[in-house]
């Protein structure tokens, strides 16, 4: 429920079919309230921007330009905080050194294109 209105960025085939099959076969269900959210998606791309951008010194701000949470809590926890912001939007703010670190990641390079 915390991420009910989050942008989905998983595989399009992930529709919960395995859960339905398991239930139909009488499998026990547990921990279905768990999730892995991500607080950094490249705008217009749906590509997760890996969290080292933040753990190495970047921060996130809302549309008003204000930092709204402690990003050190983790990217799943931060995803919930982003959803609490106007328009469910946050901007990652970082410097050239963080940019250089992130260039090693293919997803980051794709998001730049």
Model-derived segments and their meaning:
Residues 19-21, 27-113:
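An anion/pyrophosphate-binding glycine-rich loop and adjacent beta-alpha core
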Residues 9-21:
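Thiamine diphosphate
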Residues 1-10:
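Glycine-rich beta-alpha-beta "Rossmann" dinucleotide-binding loop(s) and their flanking helix/strand
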């Amino acid at each position: 429920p915390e991420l009910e209105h989050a942008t989905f960025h998983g595989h399009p085939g992930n529709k919960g079919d395995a859960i339905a099959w398991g239930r139909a076969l009488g499998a026990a269900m547990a921990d279905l309230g768990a999730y892995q959210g991500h607080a950094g998606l490249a705008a217009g791309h749906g590509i997760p921007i890996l969290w080292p951008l933040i753990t190495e010194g970047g921060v996130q701000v809302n549309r008003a330009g204000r930092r709204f949470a402690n990003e050190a809590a983790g990217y799943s926890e931060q995803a919930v905080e982003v959803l609490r912001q106007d328009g469910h939007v946050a901007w990652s703010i970082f410097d050239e050194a963080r940019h250089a670190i992130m260039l090693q990641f293919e997803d980051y390079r794709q998001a730049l294109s």
